[in-house]
């Protein structure tokens, strides 16, 4: 358990987190019920082992499913700032990132590219993130 005067953060790449019967990137990529349950159980065990306060997630195709799982694991606050792209009925081709917290997420918004930084790195104004980052303000009642 964390000390009362600290907050811990982690990141977690979920590797194609998509609830069946949907497919990721190709119509052949669909988890069976058993595979999905194993993935959910493995993620839950990993989250328990991390025992952190705030988690940033990558490769989310099923945000609602992840939000439910995180709530069950003691993270009642969850946010994404974008929607996964669905190519054709149930074929998902572009996941999103998200954040889960044990503490209230007061504000969440997409991170926008900064024009000065774009210029400094010789990037044009058409630059966009492959997956829109999340900027979140979290209330920490114990600090």
Short names for language-model regions:
Residues 60-143:
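Structured beta-strand-rich core segments of catalytic domains in phosphoester-bond hydrolases
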